[in-house]
Amino acid sequence: MYEYIKGKYIDMYKDYIVIENNNIGYKIYTSGSTMAKLPSIGENIMLYTEQIVREDFIGVYGFLTKDELSMFKLLLTINGVGAKASLSLLSISNVSTLKYAIKMGDEKTITRAPGIGKKTAQRIILELKDKIEIDILEEDDEQIINKVTDDKKVLEAVAALVTLGYSEKEANKVINSCDKNNSLEQIIKEALKYLMK
C-alpha cells in the first residue's frame, strides 16, 4: 500500500519508531540496524515500507534502504520466519553481513539473532543461499575479511553491553559510533565511557 513514508522523526521505542506526516503519527516497525542509523529526533526522514495484514494485526515496516526492505521481504518467504524474526535477523548487523553469512552457511552468525535457533538458521541458509546476490563478494578478499571481522567485533561488543544490562538499541547506537579499528576490549571500554556520561 505504501512505497515509502517521509516525515518528521518523532520518537523511538523498543521495536518501532513514530513518523509524523500531515499531523498523523505513523507507527513504523523497524530493525535495530535502521534505528542505529537514524538522525536526531525532530529531523525529517524517509523509510521504504511494507505493510503486513493478518486477521489480528496490521503493521507497517520501514527501512532506510531498499536493500534492507528487499531482504526483509525475502526472509518473510521462509516458512516459520515471520516479521518479528526477520527484524531480529536484520538487527544483528548490516544487510551485506547477513547475506554473506547465508551464502557462506555461517549458522553461528545467523543464530546471534534473538529467537533464531539452529534449525531455523539451517532453513534460512537452505532456502536463500542460491537466491541472494551479495555485493560484498565483488570486493577483493582483504576487504571481505576486514568487513566481516569488523561486523563480528560489533556483534560481540553489542552482546557484551546487553549482558551488562543495556538494551540492544542503546548498544547498537553506541558501538556504531566507536572506532572499529580498535580491539574488542577497547571498543567496549569506549562504549561504556559514553554510556556512563
UniProtKB/Swiss-Prot annotation:
Stored CDD domains: UBA_RuvA_C (cd14332)
Entry's localization field: Cytoplasm
Start and end residues of each stretch annotated as Domain III: 149-197
Xref: InterPro entries: DNA_helicase_Holl-junc_RuvA_I, NA-bd_OB-fold, RuvA, RuvA_2-like, RuvA_C, RuvA_C_sf
UniProt-annotated stretches for the region Domain II: 65-144
Pfam families reported for this sequence: HHH_5, RuvA_C, RuvA_N
UniProt keyword Cell inner membrane present: no
Region (Flexible linker): 145-149
GO biological process: DNA recombination; DNA repair
Residue ranges, annotated region (Domain I): 1-64
Main location: cytoplasm
Family, similarity comment: Belongs to the RuvA family.
Domain notes: Has three domains with a flexible linker between the domains II and III and assumes an 'L' shape. Domain III is highly mobile and contacts RuvB.
Subunit structure: Homotetramer. Forms an RuvA(8)-RuvB(12)-Holliday junction (HJ) complex. HJ DNA is sandwiched between 2 RuvA tetramers; dsDNA enters through RuvA and exits via RuvB. An RuvB hexamer assembles on each DNA strand where it exits the tetramer. Each RuvB hexamer is contacted by two RuvA subunits (via domain III) on 2 adjacent RuvB subunits; this complex drives branch migration. In the full resolvosome a probable DNA-RuvA(4)-RuvB(12)-RuvC(2) complex forms which resolves the HJ.
Protein function: The RuvA-RuvB-RuvC complex processes Holliday junction (HJ) DNA during genetic recombination and DNA repair, while the RuvA-RuvB complex plays an important role in the rescue of blocked DNA replication forks via replication fork reversal (RFR). RuvA specifically binds to HJ cruciform DNA, conferring on it an open structure. The RuvB hexamer acts as an ATP-dependent pump, pulling dsDNA into and through the RuvAB complex. HJ branch migration allows RuvC to scan DNA until it finds its consensus sequence, where it cleaves and resolves the cruciform DNA.
UniProt cross-references to HAMAP family, sorted A to Z: DNA_HJ_migration_RuvA
Protein name: Holliday junction branch migration complex subunit RuvA
